[in-house]
């Protein structure tokens, strides 16, 4: 990891913690605010710990883009949770033979940038 990339990652990490400190739930209730703040901090710690050993500059850049997108989406919609994608598991047209592999490939390609670190299939 280059010094500039390290600086950018640390800046994002600090900005997430500042965001969590100032976060207000859209409902305005204190319980929701506390729960959402805890979620933001837990999610940030988990994902940064998961990706701390990455060495490929391209993967690091993708994680930075994902982090930035999640921050922007969270601020815009006032929801700290990732927005779901609405593609049913077998929602694409079925084909014979390699059709299932094609569906899996299309499903991976259709996954938004802000959900790349989540492993579950929506």
Swiss-Prot record:
Which Pfam family is one of those matched by this entry? Complex1_LYR
Coiled-coil zones: none
What InterPro entries has UniProt attached to this entry? Complex1_LYR_dom, Complex1_LYR_LYRM1, LYRM1
Name a GO CC annotation attached to this entry.
mitochondrion
| Cited function | May promote cell proliferation and inhibition of apoptosis of preadipocytes.
Give the family from UniProt.
Belongs to the complex I LYR family.
- Write the protein's name: LYR motif-containing protein 1
What organism does the UniProt record list as the source?
Mus musculus
Source species taxonomy: Eukaryota, Metazoa, Chordata, Craniata, Vertebrata
């Amino acid at each position: 990891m280059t010094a500039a990339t390290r600086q950018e990652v640390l800046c994002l990490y600090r900005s997430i913690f500042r965001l969590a400190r100032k976060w207000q739930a859209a409902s305005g209730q204190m319980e929701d605010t506390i729960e959402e703040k805890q979620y933001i901090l837990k999610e940030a710690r988990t994902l940064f710990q998961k990706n701390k050993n990455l060495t490929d500059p391209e993967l690091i850049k993708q994680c930075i883009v994902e982090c930035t997108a999640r921050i922007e989406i969270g601020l815009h919609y006032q929801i700290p949770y990732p927005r779901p994608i609405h593609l049913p598991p077998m929602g694409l047209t079925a084909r014979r033979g390699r059709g299932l592999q094609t569906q899996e490939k299309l499903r991976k390609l259709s996954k938004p940038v802000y959900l790349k670190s989540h492993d579950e299939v929506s």
